[in-house]
A protein has these predicted regions:
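Amphipathic protein-protein interaction modules
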Residues: 42-104
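Extended, charge-biased low-complexity segments
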Residues: 1-44
Length: 105
């Protein structure tokens, strides 16, 4: 086990994101309950969760839209931090522990 010098944002699509996704692509079968969280590693020490989310919201949203195969031309216009907080459930923390002996690649 090794402590990693990073914090994290765990991001899971909310039901609003899944509803939008299904309106974009009717073949989508996933539900909000089945959606898996993605963990993004960030700076280890931070004091203001809102500032951290504001800093990384665009990168995370872009990554998530791409992860679900959404064409950039169809992304919501004027997507801001308020939309982000409604479309994604986020947990932040500052402790990451690698349980494996193999190096991270």
């Amino acid at each position: 086990m090794q402590l990693i010098n990073r914090g994290f944002i765990s991001v899971k699509p909310s039901s609003l994101f899944i509803e939008w996704l299904k309106s974009y692509d009717s073949t989508v079968l996933i539900t909000a309950e089945d959606a898996e969280a993605t963990v993004y590693l960030i700076e280890e020490e931070f004091w203001d969760d809102a500032l951290i989310l504001k800093t990384y919201a665009k990168k995370i949203a872009t990554s998530t839209f791409a992860e679900y195969g959404c064409d950039e031309a169809h992304w919501p216009s004027n997507f801001d931090i308020e939309n982000f907080e409604q479309w994604f459930d986020c947990d932040l923390g500052c402790t990451c522990i690698d349980l494996l002996a193999a190096p991270i690649q």
